[in-house]
């Protein structure tokens, strides 16, 4: 039976981001109706880590809103990493904190972070259409810095932003050049507060995107993330095809500002597809 890796997310700093990413409700440019807070309490993060690990999650990603890492965020993430690792839960810790230089990433590595997540989101050519406050090249350099720091790299993108198939191929080719160990695959869901006017991808087109990703990234862990609940709805037959077409990792629980599937019910559904849950990160 196919083994599936479960990863979970903790939004440890939410909202008030000064970047203008057109797909993100955390941007202060869009005034999304989301929870906003500076730093989540350490005790709450530890409770989340314990609960999600008990459900079977092996990856735990600490996400901060904002353009980039700074000294305060570095210290905060390092503190969380040390506290979680002290629990000996066996979690693979990922940080997702925006643009970062080599020194910052080495600091996080030494504090106990195992991987860094920084998505390319789309192609270099299409990126200026969805963000003007930073460049695609900055994202790519941060990914390179993570690798140079000796961290694992988690990097992927979003499908359904009105990009072309050529853009999708260009993004996947760039990702392949980085050889990430994990590639999150997100499907954009239309939101009235966001400026992107794009219809939700059909399940068939989403599956084609997965097939394409598998072609370019045969050795990466392909992780279905945001948008799965809407694109596949209650269509179990189509959702099961995700795993036939190359998906071998799933985000368990909620996303940054949107609800995911209820973890226990989601796991029951995955088991009904004949999948098994990985018990080790390796």
UniProtKB/Swiss-Prot annotation:
Binding positions for [4Fe-4S] cluster per the UniProt entry: 17, 21, 24
A family per Pfam: BATS
Keywords: 2Fe-2S, 4Fe-4S, Biotin biosynthesis, Iron, Iron-sulfur, Metal-binding, S-adenosyl-L-methionine, Transferase
Domain annotation Radical SAM core: ranges: 1-228
Cofactor note: Binds 1 [4Fe-4S] cluster. The cluster is coordinated with 3 cysteines and an exchangeable S-adenosyl-L-methionine. Binds 1 [2Fe-2S] cluster. The cluster is coordinated with 3 cysteines and 1 arginine.
Listed EC numbers: 2.8.1.6
Gene3D superfamilies membership: Aldolase class I
Protein name: Biotin synthase
UniProt organism field: Helicobacter pylori (strain J99 / ATCC 700824) (Campylobacter pylori J99)
Gene: bioB
């Amino acid at each position: 039976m196919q083994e599936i890796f479960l990863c979970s997310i903790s939004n440890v700093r939410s909202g008030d981001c000064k970047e203008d990413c057109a797909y993100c409700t955390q941007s202060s440019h869009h005034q999304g109706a989301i929870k906003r807070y500076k730093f989540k309490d350490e005790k709450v993060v530890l409770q989340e880590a314990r609960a999600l690990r008990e459900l079977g999650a092996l990856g735990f990603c600490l996400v901060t809103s904002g353009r980039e890492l700074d000294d305060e965020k570095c210290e905060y993430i390092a503190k969380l990493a040390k506290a979680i690792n002290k629990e000996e839960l066996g979690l693979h810790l990922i940080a997702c904190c925006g643009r970062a230089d080599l020194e910052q990433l080495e600091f996080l590595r030494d504090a106990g972070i195992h991987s860094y997540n920084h998505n390319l989101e789309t192609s270099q050519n299409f990126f200026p259409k969805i963000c003007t406050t930073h460049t695609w090249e900055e994202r790519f350099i941060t990914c390179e810095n993570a690798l140079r720091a000796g961290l694992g790299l988690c990097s992927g993108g979003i499908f359904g932003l009105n990009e072309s198939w050529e853009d999708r191929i260009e993004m996947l080719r760039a990702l392949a050049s980085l050889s990430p160990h994990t590639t999150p695959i997100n499907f954009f869901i239309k939101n009235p507060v966001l400026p992107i006017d794009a219809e939700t991808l059909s399940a068939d087109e989403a599956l084609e995107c997965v097939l394409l990703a598998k072609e370019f990234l045969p050795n990466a862990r392909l992780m279905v993330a945001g948008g799965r609940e809407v694109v596949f709805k209650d269509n179990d037959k189509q959702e099961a095809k995700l795993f036939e077409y190359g998906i071998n990792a799933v985000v368990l629980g909620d996303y940054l500002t949107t609800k995911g599937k209820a973890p226990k019910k989601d796991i029951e559904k995955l088991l009904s597809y004949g999948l098994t849950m990985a018990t080790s990160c390796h």
